[in-house]
Amino acid sequence: MSLDAVLSRIDETLPEAMDRLFALLRIPSISTDPAYRADCARAADWLAEDLRGLGFDAAARATPGHPMVVGHGGEGGRHLLFYGHYDVQPVDPLDLWHRAPFDPTVEDTPHGRVIRARGAADDKGQLMTFIEACRAWRDVHGALPGRLTVFLEGEEESGSPSLIPFMERHREELKADLALICDTGLFEDQPAITTMLRGLLGEEITITGPNKDLHSGSYGGAAMNPIRVLAGIIASLHDEDGRITVPGFYDGVTDLPEAVRAQWQALAFDHRKFLGEVGLSVPAGEHDRTPLEMLWSRPTCEVNGIWGGYTGAGFKTVLPSQAHAKISFRLVPGQDPHRLRDNFRNHVRTMVPFDCQVAFHEHGASAASVMDISDPAFEAARAALGQEWGRPASYVGCGGSIPIAGYFRSILDMDAMLIGFGRDDDQIHSPNEKYDVESFHKGIRSWARIFAALT
């Protein structure tokens, strides 16, 4: 079958593909906020209808949370399952957006044209690259490129509470030869296949001291201040060399193989440029590790939020009853998230004084994943990406967490390949999220080339 005709069709119909993406981006499918539940269902229905128009047998499947979209189509060749997620992050702080987050537009920037909207890169723009490649292939050849399953989640940004039960319940339906995940990015301007993902452990802690807020003049110096207790706990989590002090935290962590270390060094990662783009200059983390190691292959502990007492306008001399913090850990192969949760909580308990209490609330746990690149499909996809982007594709790590990659292995007994077209400056999870028009266009073309290589 002619690949050139498909690529030409993609080029010719890019404006229509952008229109469809914009229609999806206008739906505020924020999964963490119950106020947007109907919008999440609307996004799922929109995608199911679009897939049906391409010849998929597709539907939005109900779950206790937000719907899953599942579509089956095509025949012959290697059975590929594509995964993406249609839910998006909240838009706070809204006042930092240059325009309404769900009013997508194309902007001209010094670095090229970009699509500006919440979800543009994470993950609506990415998932639509796959769907648009299917559309162009069908337009040219009258059929989908092979046997395909599309599996789109609506709770990825809120911990995926329905994902494992759904996958276990529909194990046989979802089973394929290989999973394709489009939720990662390029390395600089170079195409990449992600082969290592860190796991994630989320914890919220609340320290309670007095049974109500107190006047700091009447009680200050005599009553325990939970903010001070919490600050001490947070300060205790790292030593002066940047290592995490939770007992047993590094159990099972191994050093990076020399071959992988050499490959990463060959990428010529410029940490000064990487940090400079966000107004920083000095690498943090363990002092004896390179920035790429810290980003991709070392575990971390970060404070994501801390609050308590009075934070409104003006000043209030309050001694608060409670203090709160949200803390996340990025994990690497060999670490057990459930054991680490226990170790962290035990560490915190040892630091809570007699007159205070601590409560914990968990926010998900997933182990790290390492992909098996011995499958010939990886080299075939790598070559296809290189042809499209005009430069070799690299195998890279990813500091983020995509639990579905591990679930494909543990639940469905199949490998996953992670290919994406995002960039470091896409501002995912932040105001003014964007997705390069080039990433969208060449992403569609990349999938068409991968179809030709794998199906």
What kind of feature is each model-predicted range?
Residues S2-L94, Q322, R339:
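N-terminal helical capping/dimerization or prosegment-like subdomains
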Residues G77-T149, K442:
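Active-site metal-coordination/substrate-binding segment of hydrolases
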Residues I193-T208, M417-G422:
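Flexible glycine/proline-rich, aromatic-decorated loop/lid segments
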